């Protein structure tokens, strides 16, 4: 069996090769993405493992079909970069890795939240200037006295809720589907609006859909409890960035922890030191004094990277050997 792996980082290559040696599978790995220019590299292979970031060109699906490719295994939980229906029409199964390490993202969410609540960034900036005074701008709050709203109560949302509850927070949640595992951890409310009106901190853990794109806009921020904090460790498209910046500037929100930006594709995960960034909204976001921005790194732990690499490769084998996989999304 021969598999083609795209968008491979050095650390992933080592894990992938270890997996290949154990499973007696031949791998060809490429640092670059799957594009119209690179799709011919798939010729002669049985399957594809990918870490697509930008939307996959629709013209690629029929080309893969001609090559006999029946699946693409995405190394992430999100699959919004694929045209799932078009892939299905061409007999191509798209799979994901739905649960690679919910705890990694949950722990990171709470870490950044605590940094915002206790003004750690401002304290560190003062210390670098040898300002050791105690002043009102660095005075924080007790996390355990806060109400936290979890929007999206799947694996990651629930893992996040558990940690906040461990600090003593009242945790409320909203999801179209109620998670039976959430009993005793959070209280469900009837709408997103109800959740944000009550919460001191709102944490997003929902997948992107046509219905929730830019759900968190200025109108929504005006319904937030004054001085609340927004955490987005889910998908950038959930938040209208211009409106978030305006809400922060107006004092509607106290701060924001942002790990995903809607138009991050040209920059993440790349070293852009010394380069001009043309996206002015992105520049405003990453430099805003009330924002802690991180480059889609909430998931990034040893456990998560290993599970993503092996989960995608296992899905490749499963489809090739059985015709389907338990992680199929289309």
From Swiss-Prot:
Binding sites annotated in the UniProt record for NAD(+): 155-156, 175, 206-207, 212, 233-235, 259
EC number(s) given by UniProt: 1.1.1.28
Keyword NAD found: yes
Enzyme class of the recorded protein, top EC level: oxidoreductase
Catalytic residues in the record: 235, 264, 296
Catalytic activity: (R)-lactate + NAD(+) = pyruvate + NADH + H(+)
Gene3D superfamilies referenced in this protein's UniProt entry, alphabetically: NAD(P)-binding Rossmann-like Domain (3.40.50.720)
GO molecular function: D-lactate dehydrogenase activity; NAD binding
Key words of the record: NAD, Oxidoreductase
Record has Oxidoreductase as a keyword: yes
Entry similarity comment: Belongs to the D-isomer specific 2-hydroxyacid dehydrogenase family.
UniProt name for this protein: D-lactate dehydrogenase
Taxon lineage: Bacteria, Bacillati, Bacillota, Bacilli, Lactobacillales
């Amino acid at each position: 069996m021969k598999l083609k792996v795209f968008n491979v980082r050095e650390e992933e290559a080592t894990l992938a090769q270890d997996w290949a040696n154990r499973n007696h599978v031949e791998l060809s790995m490429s640092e670059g993405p799957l594009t119209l220019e690179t799709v011919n590299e798939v010729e002669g292979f049985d399957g594809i493992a990918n870490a697509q970031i930008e939307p996959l060109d629709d013209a690629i699906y029929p080309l893969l079909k001609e090559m006999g490719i029946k699946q693409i295994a995405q190394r992430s939980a999100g699959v919004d970069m694929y045209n799932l229906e078009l892939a299905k029409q061409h007999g191509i199964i798209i799979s994901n890795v739905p649960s690679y390490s919910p705890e990694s993202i949950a722990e990171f969410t709470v870490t950044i939240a605590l940094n915002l609540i206790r003004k750690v960034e401002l304290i560190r900036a003062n210390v670098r200037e040898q300002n050791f005074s105690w002043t009102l701008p660095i005075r924080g709050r007790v996390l355990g006295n806060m109400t936290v709203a979890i929007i999206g109560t799947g694996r990651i949302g629930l893992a996040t809720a558990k940690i906040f509850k461990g600090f003593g927070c009242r945790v409320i949640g909203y999801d179209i589907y109620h998670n039976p595992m959430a009993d005793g951890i959070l209280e469900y409310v009837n709408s997103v609006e109800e959740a944000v009106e009550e919460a001191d901190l709102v944490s997003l853990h929902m997948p992107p859909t046509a219905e929730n794109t830019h759900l968190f806009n200025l109108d929504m921020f005006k319904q937030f409890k004054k001085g609340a904090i927004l955490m987005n460790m889910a998908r950038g498209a959930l938040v209208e960035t211009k409106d978030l910046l305006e809400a922060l500037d107006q004092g509607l929100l106290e701060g924001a922890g942002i790990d995903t930006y809607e138009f991050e594709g040209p920059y993440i995960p790349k070293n852009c030191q010394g380069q001009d960034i043309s996206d002015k909204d992105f520049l405003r976001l990453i430099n805003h004094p009330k924002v802690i921005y991180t480059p889609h790194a909430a998931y990034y732990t040893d456990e998560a990277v290993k599970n993503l690499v092996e989960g995608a490769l296992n899905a490749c084998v499963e489809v090739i050997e059985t015709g389907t996989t338990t992680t199929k999304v289309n």
